[in-house]
Regions:
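Secretory-pathway glycan-assembly enzymes, especially type II membrane glycosyltransferases
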Residues: 2-173
């Protein structure tokens, strides 16, 4: 009997988790920037014990269905249209904007995005009936050792990205 591929182990593990995080991909960056951010979000979910879900219906790289236009599905897909406007990435903190000296010029922009995050979380509560994490919850997993399902050893962030790449990067036939 051959060992189970990591993508199957990942899917079983992800499906066993109850608390969801819905990641919005294809927002406004180049494909590989979006892809790297998605792998980071997947690692964040594994590290925190959240179920990774994907919203890509409006992906800037898709032509009909988003992610599944090119790749096999690897997690539950969300389709609610409100994700387009309200499930957006987190931005620099007020403290970080002040440190950079851009607080005055960025205050309106930051306030607008903060309002969208609040509305997005309210919409998620109405749809799911409980707290659901959205794209703005994800923090960059820059360093450390991580435990991936099905692997006995701790892995670095680069090793984790390679493993998660084998989950997500599976072309449709």
């Amino acid at each position: 009997m051959s060992p189970q591929p990591f993508w199957q182990i990942y899917q079983e593990h992800n499906e066993s988790l109850k608390q969801p995080l819905v990641w919005h991909t294809g927002v406004d960056a180049g494909f590989f920037a979006e892809y790297s951010a998605m792998l980071n979000a997947m690692l964040y979910c594994i590290d925190r014990g959240y179920q990774f879900r994907l919203y890509s219906a409006d992906a800037n790289y898709g032509y009909a269905d988003g992610w599944t236009d090119y790749f096999k599905p690897f997690c539950p897909e969300e389709t609610a249209a409100w994700h387009h406007r309200y499930n957006i990435y987190g931005v620099a903190s007020w403290r970080e904007l002040h440190r950079r000296g851009t607080l005055r010029t960025m205050a309106l922009w930051k306030s607008k995005l903060a309002l969208r995050h609040i509305v997005g979380h309210a919409r998620a509560w109405m749809q799911y009936g409980r707290h659901v994490r959205l794209s703005d919850s994800v923090k960059w997993m820059a360093d450390g050792a991580f435990s991936l399902p099905g692997l006995s050893d701790q892995v670095t962030v680069n090793e984790a990205f390679v493993a998660l790449d084998s989950v997500a990067w599976r072309f449709n036939a």
